[in-house]
């Protein structure tokens, strides 16, 4: 595998340098070296929405890691404009493949829709590592490709956040879940984890709705839920952006302090609300390290040729008690 990667570098180097300038949301060249003589592995990080603070932290962490290890690899960072722009993410994958990168670390917007282009990358001997949102395992098996997932156990993390919320509720209380994109594995796992915790505490989930990870959609959904279920005691949101939207709706309804809210991701704004007591809890999956975990593992695969396997990364519950 290593020889195949080296053989592509001369052909792809100038294309990679051009891509650093042409991709709309991408990293500039990490150093002043001549791309034509640069024998370092070329790594592309492709994320979801760069409007989300979580992915900004992920990108910053990756850049800092590359800056601390400039001799090990070069890096280009890409993101899409919104969480559901699958076509743009596919286009970014294809563009990075055309430049002859050695590694693609991807946080896919959808667990199935990105797999065909990911398979083409693997067939080109590009090391592909999946982070954040897990690719569909059944479809991977049907395609007969090995793409490792490096990331947290989303169901367990959401369950533990839900348990923290349940400690403030009573059996029979009513809650609703505001989830992410239905086609995303991590969205389904977080909703399942929230449900696990509520069922264990004999708390009633009156509704589960998708806000596609978006703050404004979550605000609209939360407003409707508050009207439909006037006895609603809590909202469990599958990411912090949606938790912020839900909180805005609760404030507008004049129910601050009555309707409890939890999130997931531990972005800065949410962490501040946890510390002030306005948000019960969130989950920290360490955005600034998540891409780094993926990059490190991809470089290990590239160097050793080992068969890739999944790796679980930390997730911690953040509450006023932590």
Regions found by a protein language model. Name each.
Residues 1-42, 119-124:
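Short, low-complexity disordered leader/linker segments with a strong preference
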Residues 42-61, 65, 69, 76-90, ...:
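Extracytoplasmic "Venus flytrap"
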Residues 43, 89, 149-175, 217-218, ...:
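Hydrophobic alpha-helical segments within soluble ligand-binding/sensing domains
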Residues 68-82, 174-177, 195-215:
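Short beta-strand elements in bilobed, periplasmic/extracellular small-molecule ligand-binding domains
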Residues 106-123, 194, 206-207, 211-272:
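Hydrophobic alpha-helical
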């Amino acid at each position: 595998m290593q020889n195949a990667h080296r053989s592509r570098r001369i052909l792809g180097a100038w294309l990679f340098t051009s891509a650093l300038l042409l991709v709309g949301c991408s990293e500039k060249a990490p150093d002043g070296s001549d791309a034509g003589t640069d024998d370092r592995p070329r790594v592309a990080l492709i994320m979801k929405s760069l409007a989300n603070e979580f992915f900004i932290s992920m990108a910053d962490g990756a850049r800092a890691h590359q800056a601390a290890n400039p001799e090990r690899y070069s890096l280009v960072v890409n993101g899409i404009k919104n969480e559901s722009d699958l076509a743009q993410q596919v286009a970014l994958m294809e563009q990075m493949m055309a430049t002859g990168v050695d590694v693609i670390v991807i946080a896919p917007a959808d667990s199935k829709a990105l797999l065909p282009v990911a398979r083409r990358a693997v067939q080109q001997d590009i090391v592909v590592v999946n982070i954040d949102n897990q690719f569909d395992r059944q479809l991977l098996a049907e395609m007969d490709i090995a793409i490792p997932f490096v990331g947290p156990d989303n169901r367990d993390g959401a369950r533990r956040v839900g348990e923290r919320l349940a400690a403030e509720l009573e059996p029979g209380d009513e809650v609703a879940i505001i989830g992410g994109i239905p086609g995303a594995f991590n969205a389904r796992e977080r909703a399942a984890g929230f449900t696990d915790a509520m069922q264990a505490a004999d708390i009633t989930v009156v509704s589960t709705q998708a806000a596609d990870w978006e703050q404004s959609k979550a605000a609209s959904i939360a407003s409707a839920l508050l009207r439909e279920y006037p006895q609603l005691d809590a909202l469990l949101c599958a990411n912090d952006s949606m938790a912020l939207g839900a909180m805005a709706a609760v404030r507008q309804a004049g129910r601050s302090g009555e309707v409890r809210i939890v999130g997931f991701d531990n972005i800065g704004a949410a962490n501040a609300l946890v510390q002030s007591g306005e948000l019960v809890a969130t989950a920290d999956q360490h955005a600034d390290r998540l891409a780094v975990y993926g990059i490190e593992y991809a470089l290990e695969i590239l160097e050793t040729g080992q068969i890739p396997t999944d790796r679980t990364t930390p997730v911690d519950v953040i509450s006023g008690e932590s």
